[in-house]
């Protein structure tokens, strides 16, 4: 397991082998903030990516079952802690770009968008019609987001065009235009 899993299981939610870091735990929040801050400084990092491809509701629902009189509190504490974490990173690193990503766009909500941009908006990517739908649906509300292209046809490329685009192409292909 990870260092956190082995040394501080109380900083996580869940009882199985897969656990979820709990930003709602003040001690865990302080440690994570200081740890990431020190890595950003020591490695001279100026763009931070916060990925969130986790079914967090499973962990929060499990906590709700343990505390039936406190439904939703685990999620509320986690979200408040997470937003404090993001705010503190921005305070310590003014001007640093923060990229948010989540399976299916779970981090594309207003409070998070005040703090970060989705350079990669969803792991549902590359499929032209689906990405067109994402771009159409998001553009009025979230003008800056990213997608990617992994095929070299004009249709695929244009379908995946967005303000931020990832080119996932094989540079060894000699006849690629």
Where do the protein language model's features map onto the residues?
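Generic beta-strand/beta-sheet core signal
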Residues: 6, 14, 48-53, 99-103
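Active-site groove signature of glycoside hydrolases
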Residues: 17, 31-68
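Active-site-adjacent "subsite" loops/lids of carbohydrate-active enzymes
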Residues: 1-42
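Glycine-rich tight-turn/loop motif centered on a GG-T
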Residues: 10-19, 62-78
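Active-site-proximal substrate-binding groove within the catalytic cores of carbohydrate-active enzymes
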Residues: 54, 82-177
């Amino acid at each position: 397991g990870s260092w956190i899993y082995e040394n501080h299981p109380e900083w996580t939610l869940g009882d199985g082998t897969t656990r979820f870091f709990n930003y709602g735990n003040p001690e865990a929040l302080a440690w994570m903030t200081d740890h990431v801050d020190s890595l950003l400084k020591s490695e001279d990092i100026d763009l931070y990516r916060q990925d969130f491809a986790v079914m967090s509701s499973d962990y929060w629902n499990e906590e709700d079952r343990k505390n039936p009189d406190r439904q939703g509190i685990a999620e509320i504490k986690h979200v408040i802690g997470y937003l404090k974490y993001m705010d503190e990173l921005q305070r310590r690193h003014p001007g640093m770009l923060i990229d948010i990503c989540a399976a299916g766009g779970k981090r594309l909500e207003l409070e998070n968008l005040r703090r970060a941009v989705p350079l990669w908006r969803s792991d549902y990517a590359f499929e032209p019609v689906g990405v067109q739908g994402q771009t159409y649906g998001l553009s009025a509300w979230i003008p800056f987001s990213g997608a990617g292209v992994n095929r070299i046809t004009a249709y695929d490329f244009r379908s995946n065009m967005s303000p931020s685009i990832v080119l996932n192409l094989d540079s060894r292909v000699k006849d690629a235009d």
